[in-house]
Structure formats: C-alpha cells, structure tokens
C-alpha cells in the first residue's frame, strides 16, 4: 500500500 495505509487494490489494507 501507500504510506497513508491505503493500497492501490485494497483501499483498506495495511502498508
């Protein structure tokens, strides 16, 4: 995911 804690595929996954 991103540094914000949101992945591109799953907007609710961990880093």
UniProtKB/Swiss-Prot annotation:
The keyword DNA damage does not apply. GO terms for cellular component: extracellular region. It comes from the Eukaryota. Inhibited by the serine protease inhibitor AEBSF. Binds 1 zinc ion per subunit. It is an enzyme of class 3 (hydrolase). Its main location: secreted. One of its GO terms (molecular function) is toxin activity. Its cofactor is Zn(2+). It is found in: Secreted. Expressed by the venom gland. Keywords: Hemostasis impairing toxin, Hydrolase, Metal-binding, Metalloprotease, Platelet aggregation activating toxin, Protease, Secreted, Toxin, Zinc. This is Zinc metalloproteinase-disintegrin-like proatherocytin. Signal peptide: none annotated. The keyword Metal-binding applies. Its EC number is 3.4.24.-. GO terms for biological process: platelet activation; proteolysis. Stimulates platelet aggregation through activation of PAR-1 (F2R). Belongs to the venom metalloproteinase (M12B) family.
């Amino acid at each position: 995911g991103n540094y914000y804690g949101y992945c591109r595929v799953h907007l609710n996954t961990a880093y």
